[in-house]
Curated annotation (Swiss-Prot):
Job description of the protein: This enzyme participates in both the breakdown and synthesis of glucose.
Organism: Entamoeba dispar
Binding positions for substrate per the UniProt entry: T20, R24, S117, H118, K131, D293, R294, T352, E371, E372, S373, K384, R509
Encoding gene (name): pgm
Name of this chain's protein: Phosphoglucomutase
Record family assignment: Belongs to the phosphohexose mutase family.
Catalytic activity: alpha-D-glucose 1-phosphate = alpha-D-glucose 6-phosphate
Enzyme class: isomerase
Entry keyword set: Cytoplasm, Isomerase, Magnesium, Metal-binding, Phosphoprotein
A biological process from GO: carbohydrate metabolic process
EC number: 5.4.2.2
Length: 553
């Protein structure tokens, strides 16, 4: 195959920003705006420090609409910049955690991940996304994404290779391309290969398979018709021995079959209604988002919040072979995540965004980290990992059942944890697609009033109100304006922040976190006073016109 480098003028396109984890835009906007992807991909190559000289790059994605078009453009821009070692997942597939593992195992300089994560997919009403990962396997840090955004705002020229015939990537193997006298190779690989090898280093699959067989474990796994479908069959059916009937929505589709791939109680209702009832035939259930980095854990009679999952993993790490082999050095959580894990061990508190865990993992300060937004992961790779978290829970069930000489369920583990450590009652309100200026005005009002605001929580006085600022203990960098906190004398917290993962307008997220030794109370009653205070101090209805949240998690 032959390629020729072409250059042509362009003008900047507004709104090409990277948010919490990459570019997120409506697919229709990306498709219908001339040079949208060409501009942004060129900006990435112009500005990212790990793309300034040719090295090995990895490209994959969650299978959503426009991913194949984006992959073609990334390859052709890479060729035009002299890159000769390009690795892509067959048919463009590669989950985010799998790509992180592939970057690390193949010693690549960078990875392009085509995903809008938990956002819907499709031509008309779906989103498209693109993010850049670094040589450590983790998301590009703020200093890199800021430079990419600046390049996109000032771009004047598109540089791209034109191919003499279409590039097809539906067969594993090497494709040789001659570009301007250089021979480049596009390696089309099995997107499972490196990730499954990594999982074998983390878990004892033979032991887990024996446990599943011994207790006839009934499991349901929802892949939302996204990329984890191809991984779920390998992991849960081939390696654990579960029947294929355990898998739901396991065939990847460009529009995810119309499903909203956000693994929470609202959008994973099919799984929740099947597994959580006390008379459910299922012992445990899992759901994973579009690109496979988020997880939902439910059991018969039990929903395991991400915050509780992180806390329980922190107490049961000796049941997880990865930590037995590599040691358990510490835990980090994002600031809005509940303080459940704080009652178990000392923690490092970071802003929302997995990239903030990267320095801590690279420096050996932490082994486990998690976010309230259904993300859990370890230092084995540099992305959160839904399947990894699910296998941790299977490992814990196996170990607890071996100790008890009977099948121990999710509900029993959860309640035993609460009985010992107490319970953090926790809820998140999402106000989606609100007017961006109104949301920003509301946040600024609370910042302005932070030092003078007066409120109490059913008689418990306010301890302080601030705008969370993070000081990185590794590189000394400071990240400000990461969420407004109302912290009360009993440790209860109300938190407001604007999400960086939406594609339209703004999403206001309000978090409620209250600790109690009484773990059997009604959650809504426990948090009712906090909700009333939150509406009052934020004036959210006045600013947005919304009386109720779009989603409650």
């Amino acid at each position: 195959m032959q390629a020729t480098v072409k250059r042509y003028p362009t003008t900047p396109i507004s709104g090409q920003t990277m948010g919490t984890s990459g570019l997120r835009k409506r697919a229709s906007e990306v498709e219908n705006t001339p040079n949208y992807l060409e501009n942004f991909v060129n900006a990435m190559f112009n500005a990212a420090s790990n793309l300034q000289k040719p090295g090995k790059i990895i490209i994959g994605g969650d299978g959503r609409y426009l991913n194949l078009k984006a992959l073609d453009i990334i390859i052709r821009v890479a060729l035009s910049r002299g890159f000769t070692d390009i690795v892509v997942g067959k048919s463009g597939f590669m989950s985010t955690p799998a790509e992180s593992a592939t970057i690390i195992r193949r010693k690549a300089e960078a990875g392009f991940i085509m995903t809008a994560s938990h956002n819907p997919a499709g031509k008309d009403h779906g989103d498209f996304g693109l993010k850049l990962n670094m040589s450590n396997g983790g998301p590009a840090p703020l200093e890199v994404t800021s430079k990419i955004e600046e390049s996109a705002r000032n771009i004047k020229e598109i540089v791209i290779a034109e191919l003499n015939k279409p590039l097809t990537i539906d067969t594993i193997g090497d494709i040789e391309i001659e570009c301007e006298g250089k021979k480049a190779i596009v390696h089309v690989i099995d997107p499972l290969e490196d990730y499954i090898a990594y999982l074998h280093e983390c878990f004892d699959f033979e032991k887990l398979k024996q446990f599943v067989s011994k207790y006839h474990l009934k499991v349901q796994v929802d892949g939302f018709n996204a990329v984890t479908g191809i991984y779920n069959k390998k992991v849960f059916c081939e390696l654990l021995g579960l029947p294929e009937s355990s898998l739901k929505n396991a065939i990847p589709m460009p529009d995810f079959g119309g499903k909203h791939p956000d693994p929470n109680l609202t959008y994973a209702a099919e799984l929740v209604h099947a597994v959580i009832p006390e008379d459910s035939p299922y012992d445990i259930g899992f759901a994973f988002d579009g690109d496979g980095d988020r997880n939902l854990i439910v059991g018969r009679g039990a929903f395991v919040s991400p915050s509780d999952s992180l806390a329980i993993l922190s107490t049961k790490y000796n049941d997880i072979p990865f930590f037995v082999k590599n040691g358990f050095k510490g835990v980090a959580r994002s600031m809005p995540t509940s303080a459940a894990v704080d009652h178990v061990t000392s923690i490092t508190e970071t802003p929302t965004g997995w990239k903030f865990f990267g320095n801590l993992m690279d420096s050996g300060k932490i082994s486990l980290c998690g976010e309230e937004s259904f993300g859990t992961g370890c230092c084995g790779i540099r992305e959160k990992d839904g399947i990894w978290a699910a296998l941790c829970w299977v490992s814990i069930l196996a170990a607890e059942s071996e100790r008890a000489q009977r099948l121990v369920g999710v509900k029993e583990i959860l309640e035993n944890h609460w009985a010992k450590y107490g319970r953090n009652y926790y809820q998140r309100y999402d106000f989606d697609e609100v007017d961006k200026k109104a949301a920003e005005d509301m946040m600024q009002m609370m910042r302005d009033n932070a030092k003078t605001v007066k409120c109490d929580l059913n008689g418990v006085p306010l301890k302080f109100c601030d705008d969370f600022e993070y000081h990185d203990s590794v590189d000394g960098s400071v990240t400000s304006k990461q969420g407004i906190r109302f912290v009360f004398e009993d440790g209860s917290r109300i938190i407001f922040r604007l999400s960086g993962t939406g594609s339209v307008g703004a999403t206001i997220r309000v978090y409620f976190d209250k600790y109690s030794k009484d773990y059997k109370a009604d959650q809504n009653k426990m948090l009712a006073d906090m909700v009333t205070v939150a509406y009052a101090v934020s004036q959210i209805t006045k600013f947005t016109g919304r009386e109720k949240p779009s989603v409650v998690t």
